[in-house]
Regions:
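Alpha-helical transmembrane segments and their helix-start/interface "positive-inside/aromatic belt" motifs
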Residues: 49-58, 135-150
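Alpha-helical transmembrane segments
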Residues: 14, 36-46, 119-136
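Membrane-interfacial helical/loop segments at transmembrane boundaries in membrane proteins
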Residues: 79-87, 162-178
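Alpha-helical multi-pass transmembrane bundles of energy-transducing inner-membrane proteins
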Residues: 1-41
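Interfacial segments of multi-pass membrane proteins
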Residues: 1-3, 77-99
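Hydrophobic alpha-helical transmembrane segments of multi-pass small-molecule transporters/permeases
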Residues: 11, 15, 31, 59-65, ...
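Predominantly late transmembrane helices and immediately cytosolic-facing juxtamembrane segments
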Residues: 22-26, 95-133
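Hydrophobic alpha-helical membrane-insertion segments
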Residues: 58-69, 144-163
Length: 178
């Protein structure tokens, strides 16, 4: 870690956010597997029209994990980036490499999820799988997806008012800095 207050807070916030957006993505993948009978992307396609709520949840989760504003992944990654910059102000130029590596990781994550979104939801169906009676998540599967996607948005739009204030600051406040 960066050892700075903002870096530690950013790391804790990112752990919380990771649990939220990764859970969203896993739930959406589960719905796709349950409804389509496969998670092989080359056998899917065109599911956005058949599963709009699942597509929306996957889209929010993918953008959040990639650090796109105004979602929660951006807010915590921004704090981590600030921690890198603050910790590097007295250490020469090594911080630039760490910052570039972190940003490159986010860009590569976005690229991978663009492929997932396109192959699963947006491209023309490659097999007869989408001609089956595929439907979106039911209420029991859909409510958690919608709730977690909403948390991704709320934690991104109001990062300091909600998660940082109530979860992160109390934890960071207990750490003694030298």
């Amino acid at each position: 870690g960066t050892g700075t207050a903002v870096g530690i807070a950013g790391g804790l916030f990112h752990m919380l956010n990771h649990a939220v957006y990764k859970s969203t993505l896993f739930l959406c993948a589960g719905v796709v597997e349950k409804r389509a009978g496969t998670t092989e992307m080359d056998r899917l396609g065109g599911l956005a029209k058949l599963m709009p709520w699942t597509f929306a949840g996957t889209l929010v989760g993918a953008l959040a994990i990639s650090g796109i504003p105004p979602l929660n992944g951006f807010a915590s990654k921004w704090m981590v980036y600030q921690g890198i910059i603050v910790s590097g102000k007295d250490d020469g130029t090594l911080w630039v490499i760490w910052l570039a590596a972190a940003m490159l990781g986010s860009a590569l994550t976005l690229a991978s999820f663009v492929k997932v979104l396109h192959a699963t939801y947006l491209c023309k169906p490659t097999t007869a799988i989408t001609r089956r009676n595929i439907r979106d998540a039911g209420v029991a599967m859909g409510i958690p997806i919608v709730f977690l996607a909403a948390v991704c948005i709320v934690f991104g739009v109001f990062p300091t008012a909600l998660p940082v204030r109530f979860f992160i600051e109390p934890a960071v406040g207990t750490i003694a800095f030298s």
